[in-house]
Structure formats: structure tokens, C-alpha cells
Amino acid sequence: MPSVFLLFDIGNTNVKIGIADHDGVVASYVLPTDTHQTGDSLGLRLADVVRHAGFAPGDVTACVASSVVPSFNPLMRQACGRYFDRRLLLAPEDIAIPLENRYERPQEVGADRLVAAFAARRLWPAPRSIVSVDYGTATTFDCVQGEAYLGGLICPGVHSAAGALAAGTARLPRISLDVREDLPVVGRSTSMSLNHGFVFGFASMTEGLCHRLSAVLEAPMQVVATGGFASAIARVSNCFDHVRPDLLLEGLRILYMESGIKG
């Protein structure tokens, strides 16, 4: 019987779901972070996700999550317990993240940022410093030096920036980030102007901040892009050494396997 792990990146907007084996993440899905649903409705949807990936609910041997939405955690615990007969393991509450946390108030750091930083260090141990750039609800730059999480930078996310712009602008076209060109085009429509402005604007912001971070972090430094918009931004930027949209899910998988805890 196959053995797989069910991994959850519980964010403010979406829950990213990963199905992984001992070698890596084999499938990923996205559901909305709906705190008004029941544990049963969530559990049934998760069971369908597992079946869609070609597995049975009984194949799930562990459920592991990072969460920045505390009100969602009881729903996920109920769903995992009832539909997979597994307790939900939360990082860092149930599984410690083996990085020295140098934040002034360590409890303020989101679990997602710590897990992504941990994953970056485990996957690329060679560089002295590594920066994980996560394009999520916010765009975060998380800095690891040696085995220490130093902190980072937080900027607006692509969706949140687009939402703020739409809130103050009438008849704003939808931003798709569908840009095929390698250089920005002088837009001759509002849609093109927005898409090129966002893609190349966020790419330039990333390049500028990473250049400045390289002056304060110990060399050599590498940069990894992750999150939903990582591929779109990385296509037009040469500042990334690695692109791993599922970095956080991979971090949860490695964290669980290293912990020795049984689900």
C-alpha cells in the first residue's frame, strides 16, 4: 500500500495542499481559506483531492501544516482526524523548526516564513546566506545566514496591490500577469499597461531589494523564488538562483521526515 503525506500551507487567502511521498511533492492543489465551512465539508473535499491524485484516504500516513489563520486550524484538525484518522501536526507548535530565530519577538514570525526559510536552507546548504522571496498575499523576503533565521522584509503582494488599486479606480481590467515579452512594452491598452507594470514592477522591486540585501548579508548569497506568482516574475528576472513554487510544502515534508514524529 502506498504511503503519502498530506501537507497544508494555510494562508490568509488560500490553503495550498500538497501530496508527497518520501522523495518529494507529487501533486498540489489550492482551496480557498473558508472559515465558515464545517469540518465535514472540508474533510470531504480533502478526501476528493487525495483521490484525484490517485491515492486513497487510507494511504495518508501524516497530516502536516503551517498556518497563519488560527481560526481555521480546528476545522483542519477535525477533517484530518475524521477522514484520514490522523492528527494534524502544526509547525512549529507540534514540530519544532530547527533554525535559530533571531526575530526580536520570535512569536511574531509567521510559520509560513519560517518553514520556507528552513526549506531553502535544507535544499541549498552550500551558500552562506539564502533569501527566500515568497509571492503570496504579501511579498516576503526571508533571510537565512548559516543556521539562523535573521528576519526579512515584507512588501505588498501582487493580489493585494491589485486589490488596493481596484478599490480606488473605476472599471479597472483584471490583472492576469500574462506577459510573454522579456522586456516591458509601452502599453497601448489599460490591460497591457497593468500587466506589464505589475510583472516588471515586482521584478524590479525584487532585483533592487536583493541587490541591497547582498550588501548586508554574508557572501555567497543565493535567492529562491516561491509562491503563486514566482514563475511569472522569475521569467523576466535574472536575480533568482532557484525557482520552487512549492518550497513551503517541500519544507513541511522535510520537516516531518526529519522529526521522527509519527502522524
From Swiss-Prot:
EC number of this enzyme: 2.7.1.33
Record localization: Cytoplasm
GO MF annotations, alphabetized: ATP binding; metal ion binding; pantothenate kinase activity
Cofactor section: NH4(+); K(+)
This protein's pathway: Cofactor biosynthesis; coenzyme A biosynthesis; CoA from (R)-pantothenate: step 1/5
Superkingdom in the source lineage: Bacteria
Annotated catalytic residues: 112
Binding site for ATP: 9-16, 137
Disulfide partners: none
UniProt KW keywords: ATP-binding, Coenzyme A biosynthesis, Cytoplasm, Kinase, Metal-binding, Nucleotide-binding, Potassium, Transferase
Main location: cytoplasm
Known function: Catalyzes the phosphorylation of pantothenate (Pan), the first step in CoA biosynthesis.
Name by which UniProt lists this protein: Type III pantothenate kinase
Gene name in the database record: coaX
